[in-house]
Amino acid sequence: MIKNENREAKVLAQNICMSVFKARRVIDQIRGRSYEEALMILELMPYRASYPILKLVYSAAANASHNMGLNEVDLFISKAEVNRGTIMKKLKPRARGRSYLIKKTTCHIKIFLKEKYKV
């Protein structure tokens, strides 16, 4: 009997000060890619969202190698998702004693790494 182990390394970052749409633009480029290919893509992307995601991919690979004993060369990004986080509200003073509401959006990022199946 062949035992199929579903071992996944995951990493979660919460309340990253970034728009969900801007983070999704970067995440969509690396979903389903190998670990090394995702690192190359993230290092060359000109977006501000790529640096926190790069740190998360590094962390997920470190979790996979340290906690589960997986080889980093065989890893690929099985799932990557960006969800809306809390919205921080601030008041900006305006003329004549009024104030406007400023909404600072945050997002939650989850990245899952799996090992490629060897045939």
From Swiss-Prot:
The record's GO molecular-function terms, alphabetically, read: rRNA binding; structural constituent of ribosome
User: What biological-process GO terms show up in the record?
Assistant: translation
User: Where would one find coiled-coil regions in this protein?
Assistant: none
**Superkingdom to which the source organism belongs:** Eukaryota
Q: Which CDD domains match?
A: Ribosomal_L22
Compartments (UniProt record): Plastid, Chloroplast
Q: Which is a Gene Ontology cellular component entry for this protein?
A: chloroplast
PROSITE patterns for the chain: RIBOSOMAL_L22
Q: Which keywords does this chain's UniProt record carry?
A: Chloroplast, Plastid, Ribonucleoprotein, Ribosomal protein, RNA-binding, rRNA-binding
Q: Which InterPro entries match?
A: Ribosomal_uL22, Ribosomal_uL22_bac/chlpt-type, Ribosomal_uL22_bac/org-type, Ribosomal_uL22_CS, Ribosomal_uL22_sf
According to the record's subunit comment, the protein's assembly and interactions are: Part of the 50S ribosomal subunit.
- PANTHER family, alphabetically? CHLOROPLAST 50S RIBOSOMAL PROTEIN L22-RELATED, LARGE RIBOSOMAL SUBUNIT PROTEIN UL22M
Q: Which family does it belong to?
A: Belongs to the universal ribosomal protein uL22 family.
**What role is this protein assigned?**
This protein binds specifically to 23S rRNA. The globular domain of the protein is located near the polypeptide exit tunnel on the outside of the subunit, while an extended beta-hairpin is found that lines the wall of the exit tunnel in the center of the 70S ribosome.
Q: Could you tell me what this protein is called?
A: Large ribosomal subunit protein uL22c
Organism, by scientific name, is: Phalaenopsis aphrodite subsp. formosana (Moth orchid)
Its gene name is rpl22
